[in-house]
Design a protein with these regions (language model features):
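Surface-exposed, charged secondary-structure patches
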Residues: 2-12, 98-150
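Short, low-complexity N-terminal intrinsically disordered segments enriched in polar/charged residues
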Residues: 42-72
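Extracytoplasmic/secreted proteins, especially bacterial periplasmic and envelope-associated proteins
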Residues: 62-65, 69, 81, 102, ...
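Short, well-ordered alpha-helical segments enriched in acidic and aromatic residues
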Residues: 78-89
Length: 158
């Protein structure tokens, strides 16, 4: 098996901390089958009972409301609504390269290049609730969207 990434590793070698899963081939009795394992385990809840205490001082419900607001607006194609839940500049990563979207106007102008049907299909399978937390941010799915205390801060496109 080998580590798989989503482009956010910035050319660094993949390992358990920056990969989104493992892929490879399974061989047995002359049969060959593809194997794909996606990362997505849950973080443990801190002793305080606050899931997002490493991300924000606000309540978990308030933080998730922002993440869900972004998620619902994106899936609805609501550019203005989604921008309300973005922590600009927004980092957009794809194929090992990244760029910054610096404003709501830039997000609107780049919308169709960012929120492609393939990316939307990935997001539709995810749920912004009890998200994993790493390095002071919460991640949706396998790191497809990262949220800071102020809103969506990074997107990792397929």
């Amino acid at each position: 098996l080998k580590f798989t990434g989503n482009g956010s590793e910035g050319g660094k070698p993949l390992d358990f901390t920056n990969s989104v899963g493992l892929e490879g081939t399974w061989f047995k009795d002359g049969k060959t089958l593809p194997v794909k394992l996606a990362a997505g385990g849950q973080s443990s809840v801190p002793a305080s009972g606050r899931w997002y205490e490493m991300v924000t001082d606000e309540s978990d419900a308030a933080f998730e409301a922002k993440a869900q607001g972004f998620y619902k607006a994106v899936l609805a194609g609501d550019k203005t609504g989604a921008a309300k839940y973005v922590d600009f500049p927004l980092r957009v990563n794809q194929n090992g390269k990244g760029h910054l979207v610096r404003s709501a106007a830039e997000l609107s102008a780049q919308w169709d290049r960012i929120f492609t049907p393939a990316y939307l299909d990935i997001l539709k399978k995810e749920m912004p609730h009890d998200m994993s937390v790493s390095k002071g941010q919460a991640m949706l799915g396998a790191g497809d969207v990262w949220f800071s205390s102020k809103g969506a801060s990074a997107l990792n496109l397929p």
